[in-house]
């Protein structure tokens, strides 16, 4: 184990354990998966229009990951799954995939207790199974939160079927991290990498709006929700949500104006702009911002710590909060 001492926590970092990949390779082809090994690069898989990989060593090999973390000056990664999650699988297989992934998170933490923690995945498309996995995973070593897509098989997070799961997560005291998988209008976003560049941030905004207008945040006042990609479109378009609330009677059912929900969320730094990070600080506050990288995808920050520490408009206290203190408090480190 590396003995380097850093004070930076990356909350947006993806991980594919070999045990999880083995299950996809074995069972995926029977459920619409195309799975292949790209020579010299690792496995690549496709489900519908979602293509993932090649999944290189940094996604799988914990020692390779720790080496990168040391090079970046990062103390800890909060490990999470990426597309296509487990929602493609029927109940029993989805449960097995989730348990396999979350058990791998626990083993990673036990191997590197100061460096690696986990955000547990859930078979939330099967809410009864998800409820059981919330209970089980919350007790695993190193699990510090839960990870859910911004929509699940076409259902938005305001769907009543998901409410019991969110209630159980709230009761656990652990935060809920969101991440896009399917994106709105993907047929128009296939060119120019727009599925990621535009589709993902708009998905985050739509998910936030559903949690607000769907009453989820009102019903669950202690639920902590973390948005990726600096909140996507949500913090930038909250004025439009506010205007709709002011002018439309059918939006008056929520307890307060949409802008008042900005601080119900946390936001990572994966916005790729000094201006975005400054906006989050000015409008929401540095105490709600968490450092992220999007490792180990090619779009990830090479120097996620420096993005914050070199920011010209943030003071030393704000930088400490974003790089380390907020995540340490939220994830109980």
Where are these regions (language model features)?
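Helix-coil boundary/capping segments in enzymes
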Residues: 1-333
């Amino acid at each position: 184990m590396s003995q380097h001492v850093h004070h930076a926590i990356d909350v947006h970092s993806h991980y594919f354990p070999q045990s999880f990949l083995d299950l996809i390779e074995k069972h995926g082809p029977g459920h619409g998966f195309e799975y292949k090994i790209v020579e010299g690069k690792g496995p690549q898989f496709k489900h519908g229009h979602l293509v993932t990989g090649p999944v290189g060593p940094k996604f799988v090999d914990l020692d390779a990951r720790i080496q990168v973390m040391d090079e970046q000056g990062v103390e800890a990664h909060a490990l999470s799954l990426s597309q296509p999650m487990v929602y493609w699988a029927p109940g029993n297989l989805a449960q097995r995939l989730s348990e396999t992934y979350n058990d791998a998170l626990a083993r990673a933490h036990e191997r590197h207790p100061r460096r690696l923690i986990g955000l547990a995945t859930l078979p939330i498309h099967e809410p009864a199974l998800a409820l059981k996995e919330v209970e089980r995973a919350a007790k695993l070593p190193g699990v510090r939160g839960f990870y859910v897509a911004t929509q699940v098989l076409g259902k938005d997070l305001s769907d009543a079927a998901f409410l019991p799961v969110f209630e159980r997560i709230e009761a656990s005291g652990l935060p809920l991290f969101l991440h896009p998988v399917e994106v709105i209008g993907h047929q128009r976003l296939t060119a120019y990498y727009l599925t990621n560049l535009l589709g993902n941030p708009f998905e985050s905004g739509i998910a936030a709006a559903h949690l607000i207008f769907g009453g989820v945040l009102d019903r669950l006042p202690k639920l902590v929700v973390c948005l990726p990609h600096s909140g996507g479109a949500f913090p930038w378009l909250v004025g439009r949500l506010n205007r709709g609330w002011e002018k439309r009677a059918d939006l008056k059912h929520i307890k307060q104006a949409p802008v008042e929900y900005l601080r119900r969320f946390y936001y990572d730094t994966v916005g790729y702009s000094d201006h975005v990070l400054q906006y989050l600080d000015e409008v929401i506050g540095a105490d709600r911002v968490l450092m992220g990288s999007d490792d180990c995808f090619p779009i990830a920050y090479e120097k996620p710590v420096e993005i914050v520490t070199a920011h010209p408009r943030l003071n030393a206290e704000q930088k400490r909060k974003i790089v380390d203190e907020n995540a340490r408090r939220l994830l109980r480190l």
